[in-house]
């Protein structure tokens, strides 16, 4: 009997890519597969997304994994390179890089490369995390233009801080700032990530960068992926390893924090915080088993979770429960725990088996 297993539906993944293309029909798609494709498996996900135009990752090791796995499409390093030595690796492996600070610019000017590298200049239009400040952007761009180690044309990218249709002022200002800077400059432009792809068509430029939406997950609170025509890609399952009679007044788990008010049956699932399921999940967090929702009770342990199956339960050892997936949205589970969906899906550990279906 397998323990915790993440079932990844590649057909749903490809559906989501097609749906995203419908939201941005004039843009190329840069599939964001950082953090092990948000916990879904970096290389297999990239291989399944054959219709993506580009891929992007956060770290150079992720990019090299894609190249060694046979991915030949352009790959962008979203945080850029971290050291001078990285530049030769990028050049040899034809990996494109974001440039967002003067230290990277100086490194590009100093290094000797047999061929130039492709860069995306990141400008800070309001996120205030990475990017060249607007008042420094013209001079920065000109130095890139003059640098023989930089392939031309230079592409330009930014990131929106808060896609909120009810308060669009900040987003609109960021878009205006971006458009003012890129006016008349050649090369590809990119603003929109998942949220802006779905709700902000005025931000769609040459390239859009779907991340969380690719995996069927809403980037917005109080909504699920299906609200936007997206399908969940991951279903996290685990088997019942015990079904126990439980008397009224008995506790369960560490510190006995939960006390049964009535006689019931408790089930024990083979999953815990050692698998990446949050220890902070409170009593009442939902689990799906045998066509119904049941609550977690007591503390999440390293390897196990207890659930209240009810006094009339007929569940058996070996029955599989869904922690999130088709029957129970990840967004709903995240809201119970107080996590974002981004955190929850990317926290799974290597102990969770991954199974791919088409």
UniProtKB/Swiss-Prot annotation:
It comes from the Bacteria. SUPFAM superfamilies: Alanine racemase C-terminal domain-like, PLP-binding barrel. One of its GO terms (biological process) is D-alanine biosynthetic process. The keyword Isomerase applies. It comes from Hamiltonella defensa subsp. Acyrthosiphon pisum (strain 5AT). Catalyzes the interconversion of L-alanine and D-alanine. May also act on other amino acids. It is an enzyme of class 5 (isomerase). It catalyses: L-alanine = D-alanine. This is Alanine racemase. The keyword Isomerase applies. The gene is alr. Pathway: Amino-acid biosynthesis; D-alanine biosynthesis; D-alanine from L-alanine: step 1/1.
